[in-house]
Structure formats: C-alpha cells, structure tokens
Design a protein with these regions (language model features):
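Ser/Thr-glycine-rich phosphate-binding loops at phosphate-binding pockets of nucleotides
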Residues: 139, 143-144
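Cys-dependent protein tyrosine phosphatase-like superfamily
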Residues: 1-134, 147-246
C-alpha cells in the first residue's frame, strides 16, 4: 500500500480482522510466528466479548487490550447477533437499512467513547517497538474499518486507496453472506430481509464517507480531527511513519 509520498506501508505490521474466536491452530501459528503478532486490540463491548471471547489462553505471547468504541447502551445494530435475532430485526425494519448504518458511522468516529478508544489505539501504535498489531470488532468492517481509516490517513495513504482497502471487506465476507442468506431463504425471509442483510454485512462507500464528512463538519478536515480530537501531532505522525512505512 503506497502513500502520497511514494513510501509503502510495512507488510505484516498492521492487521485488521473480524472476531477471533474461530481461529484455528494454523491461523494462530501464522499470526504469532510468521507475522510476529504482539498486540490484539478488541474494539467491541464487554457483552460482545462475553459472547465471542478472544482466544487469549491459546496466544500467551500476545497482549490483549480492550478498547470499546461504543458503550453497551449505544452499540445498537453493530452488536453481535445470532441469525434469528437478525431476522427478527430485519423483518420489522421500516427505515432504509443503508441509512441506519450510515448514521452509525459518525458516532463510531466522533462519539466520546470512540475518541477515547482511538486515542489509546494510537498510543499503542506509537509505543510498540516491534511485531504486528491486530485490531478487530465483530465483522471487521465498521469500528475496525474506521480505525484502519485513521491510521492509514495518518500515514499518508491516499483516500482512494483507503476506500479500496475498506471495500475489500466484501471479498472476505462473501462466505458468511452466503451462509446467512441461505438461512434467510430457508425460513422464507430472504425477500423481506435481503436489502437489510446486505446493508449490515457489507461495506459501502457511503458509510466511510459519512464518517469523513462528519469529521470535516466538526473539525474542518480529517487531519484536524487527528490532531485536535485525538492529539496526533505532526511529530507523532512522523514517528508513526518511521515505524510503519519504508
């Protein structure tokens, strides 16, 4: 991934992911031994972690840090759901599901809990001397996608490349989307819930743009949000570049 100055993001240092509970032994071997994973940042709420805990006991070499972007009361539709609760919500939904998700993104970037989490996220990025850092939420696209937006922007990656990376979520989500769609179809709910299904399980340009526009409206630019909102000064951005670019 190339920056506007022609530098590149170092491979195997910055990793975004969905929940980790289903990691195989081989997955853990690759992350710990090949990627030299040293820190995992969990952006989910306590309740989400209880439902799908990280495999901490299987990765003793790794430090796990909990940085919830939402409070329990605010997490709403981004909360971990089973298929039946998803179907119930989708069948009762009256508002445009894409609009619902778009409205979540500004809060997930600018909310008090989110700002607190992203400040600590950058502290960890600045403090880690070696090895990889992995951050994740439940699906790996909303909270995790915004964290990726922030670090990549801070490193000077152009917006179109950041968007391309964000939308790559849809490639990796196809298997899950097919499985959930099959459950909908089996229970004769696909026609009623298919749009909502796509809205909540896929990445859309409008989602990330909604967050960026909210930051620009409040701070003037994403750069100003980084500096004024999160305390990422030009000096800190230079340190990040030294660590994660070549």
């Amino acid at each position: 991934m190339e920056t506007v100055t022609g530098q590149r993001v170092r491979a195997k240092r910055l990793i975004r992911s969905d929940k980790l509970e289903k990691l195989t032994d081989h997955d853990i071997h690759v992350l710990v031994d090949e990627y030299e994973l040293r820190t995992v940042i969990d952006l989910r709420t306590d309740k989400e972690r209880e439902l799908s805990p990280d495999p901490t006991s299987r990765m003793p070499e790794v430090k796990f840090v909990n940085l919830p972007v939402f409070t329990e009361g605010a997490v709403g539709i981004t909360h971990e759901h089973d298929i039946r609760s998803l179907m119930k919500e989708f069948s009762q939904m009256k508002e445009d599901p894409y609009k619902i998700v778009r409205n979540i993104y500004p809060m997930a970037l600018l909310g008090d809990e989110a700002v607190k989490a992203y400040k600590q996220f950058f502290d960890i990025l600045l403090e880690q001397e070696e090895g990889a850092i992995l951050w994740h939420c439940s699906e790996g696209k909303d909270r995790t996608g915004l964290a990726s937006l922030l670090i990549l922007h801070a490193l000077g990656v152009p917006p179109e490349t950041i968007m391309e990376d964000y939308l790559a979520t849809n490639i990796f989500a196809r298997k899950k989307l097919r499985r959930v769609a099959h459950d909908f179809e089996h229970l004769h709910l696909l026609k009623k819930g298919d749009e909502a299904l796509l809205a909540f399980l896929t990445a859309e340009p409008g989602y990330l743009n909604a967050a960026c526009e909210a930051a620009e409206e409040k701070y003037g630019s994403l750069d100003s949000y980084l500096e004024e909102g999160l305390g990422i000064t030009p000096e800190k951005r230079a340190r990040l570049a030294e660590k994660y670019l070549f």
